[in-house]
Amino acid sequence: MIIATLTGRTIEDMVELAIEAVEQGADALEVRLDYLENLDMSTALRAVRECTRYERVVATLRREEEGGLYKGDEDRRLEILERVSSEADYVDLELDVAEEEIISPSCETIVSYHNFENTPPKEELIGIRDRCAELGDVAKVVTMARGHEDALRILEVVRTAEAPTIGFAMGEEAKYTRVVSVLIGGFATYAAVRKKAAPGQLTVEETRKLLELLG
């Protein structure tokens, strides 16, 4: 499954990107609420769903320290996520948030771990993956690769997962993990429509073509 990351600054931008993502072959849509210039986030989610008739919409409000744009109060962020969950099929919750059980979304959850510095050892990654899976409906483990050994390690974590798992490595040298992870059983991968939201991210069209070629 290809999840297109939508990074529009306005609701109109989000809708335009959503339509483009569907045309490029996306299977699901991630609405990056932290990119919106206003807080009318429920309306943005509804607009994306209505314009595409998509059944799979992911709501993400990523805080700055995890690569997002949200700089506001954390309690406010969690309040927003809980509220907008009624308009989404999945809400992305960071592992530390899920562990504290502060909020109870009314949809399924992707419990995520992001490491922008490195890729931890295999056993540590497996522990993180399993904890994410225990707390959510889908586990997501994303790390920064400093070489191919790191990339292969994250792929092994995906390959051996028993629960639905998203996993890949960031960085130019490891961009292939975004495609290979799906081919070896990963639940999904993320792709850009225009503006890339993470290091090494491919576009929806690039991802789809590679999956068709290699699959």
Curated annotation (Swiss-Prot):
Catalytic activity: 3-dehydroquinate = 3-dehydroshikimate + H2O
Highest taxon above the source species: Archaea
A Pfam family per the record: DHquinase_I
GO molecular function per UniProt: 3-dehydroquinate dehydratase activity
Gene3D superfamilies named in the record: Aldolase class I
EC number assigned by the record: 4.2.1.10
Pathway field: Metabolic intermediate biosynthesis; chorismate biosynthesis; chorismate from D-erythrose 4-phosphate and phosphoenolpyruvate: step 3/7
Keyword Acyltransferase (UniProt): no
Biological role: Involved in the third step of the chorismate pathway, which leads to the biosynthesis of aromatic amino acids. Catalyzes the cis-dehydration of 3-dehydroquinate (DHQ) and introduces the first double bond of the aromatic ring to yield 3-dehydroshikimate.
Protein name: 3-dehydroquinate dehydratase
Organism taxonomic ancestry: Archaea, Methanobacteriati, Methanobacteriota, Methanomada group, Methanopyri
Gene encoding the protein: aroD
